[in-house]
Amino acid sequence: MHFHFSKMHGLGNDFMVVDCITQNIFFSPDLIRRLADRHTGVGFDQLLVVEAPYDPETDFHYRIFNADGSEVEQCGNGARCFARFVRMKGLTNKYSINVSTKKGKMVLKIEDNDLITVNMGIPEFEPGKIPFKAKQPEKTYILRTDVHTLFCGAVSMGNPHVVTVVDDVDTADVDTLGPLLESHERFPERVNAGFMQVVNREEVRLRVYERGAGETQACGSGACGAVAVGITQGLLAENVKVRLPGGDLHISWQGPGKPLLMTGPATHVFDGQLSC
């Protein structure tokens, strides 16, 4: 099998992006894991696959696979790279691009300043739709592990997120708590774990341990989930700068029932071709 690909990143969250409209490729979990290996493969956090639309009201179908081969519902940084890729490769000439995902639909807008704004949809706090095991929605939940008791918010941005407010992200024990939260029994489909330091009402610092990928340089949906939780807990304003290890994202949300907007860059690194 021979195919072309692009390597891209959104604030250091890196992707292998493949056009599966003009190329016929099947990505098995084993192949994805081999390609994701940073020593013997291409190396990436996620594989992004561009497919023809499943829905006549959309322009493309957007699929995301983690480095462990699992398919996931959402990736905000990937969505920005997806938009740049389909424009760069001549698959569309639109500046506003409608895509479907495993869990819903998104609108990707290429801005004049070369940034990309993604309409991430309406944050979902209903436990059963996250999914999260709880009797009713709460602004803050208590999660217990064998040795830790954590106060967290939970939300779906098309994929599940748990958010813990910390005093300092630099000293947060992400390496220990990330895996414990990711596989916590109250999240039946596992979860992305965010650790948020509130600098002020319009700025936060964030580290994210991603489900199936580990800690990444940036997580777009994680930034969105963190801000949504922060706003519902009364900690943040409607417009927030999120400072991640890989760079900054700007998140805007007017509150319950309203769509959340994420704005940030998407960088093309190189094009390549593989035979495997």
From Swiss-Prot:
Keyword field contains Transcription regulation: no
Catalytic activity: (2S,6S)-2,6-diaminopimelate = meso-2,6-diaminopimelate
Pathway in which this enzyme or protein is active: Amino-acid biosynthesis; L-lysine biosynthesis via DAP pathway; DL-2,6-diaminopimelate from LL-2,6-diaminopimelate: step 1/1
Site-annotated residues for Could be important to modulate the pK values of the two catalytic cysteine residues: H161, E210
Protein residues bound to substrate: N13, Q46, N66, G76, N77, N159, N192, E210, R211, G220, S221
UniProt subcellular location: Cytoplasm
One GO cellular component term: cytosol
This enzyme's EC code(s): 5.1.1.7
EC category: isomerase
Site feature (Important for dimerization) residues: F270
NCBIfam families for the chain: DapF (TIGR00652)
HAMAP family: DAP_epimerase
Homology family: Belongs to the diaminopimelate epimerase family.
Listed name of the protein: Diaminopimelate epimerase
Organism, as annotated: Vibrio atlanticus (strain LGP32) (Vibrio splendidus (strain Mel32))
Gene name of the encoded protein: dapF
